[in-house]
């Protein structure tokens, strides 16, 4: 970083009747006015280069919203104002991180919970899902067969384990739109909670 970059910030030069923008930099605490004679006055006003962090977050979010027609419409709807306020408070990075975490959690927890429940039910070996799910059933069955492997053969019924796991996997796949909705809705709330430990740590460091 050069000395010029360190001690100067953006300024606005007012000459005569019209302003002239100069890309100089200077500490935001200082404001200088300079008058010269003859030929009128020259006024130099230094503009702060530090934007409010909240303002920066809102600007980033607006750019993201503007890329989606749906988000733009929802943002303009007063019914969803509370949600978008939460989104602005949480920030972009925590919200996106929260979305991915929730997306995975809403897949893993239902999968293993359904798997356990279905295994403990008396599912027949001839159990079949509707015909239009045959393709999905086959791919999920192959994935479950690889996952189970030989590790559970001694203590559990392998065929029943694979069948119940396959049905659970198919169910979770079908719930994909619901999972997406939950992840989008919960992201700003979870994101704000995710920030708490870092905010506390920052507060302790400042002390």
Curated annotation (Swiss-Prot):
The text of the family note is: Belongs to the MRX11 family.
Supply the name of the protein: MIOREX complex component 11
Q: What's in the keyword line of the UniProt record? A: Membrane, Mitochondrion, Mitochondrion inner membrane, Transit peptide, Transmembrane, Transmembrane helix
Q: Which InterPro entries match?
A: Mrx11 (IPR018811)
**How does it associate, per the subunit comment?**
Associates with the mitochondrial ribosome.
Show which residues sit on the Mitochondrial intermembrane side of the membrane. 120-177
Q: What does this protein do?
A: Component of MIOREX complexes, large expressome-like assemblies of ribosomes with factors involved in all the steps of post-transcriptional gene expression.
Its Gene Ontology cellular component terms are: mitochondrial outer membrane; mitochondrion
Which gene is this protein's source? MRX11
Q: Where is the transit peptide, renumbered to this chain?
A: 1-46
**Membrane topology field:** Multi-pass membrane protein
Q: Where are the transmembrane segments?
A: 99-119, 178-198
Q: Where in the cell is it found?
A: Mitochondrion; Mitochondrion inner membrane
- Pfam families found in the cross-reference section: FLILHELTA
* Mitochondrial matrix domain ranges by topology: 47-98, 199-207
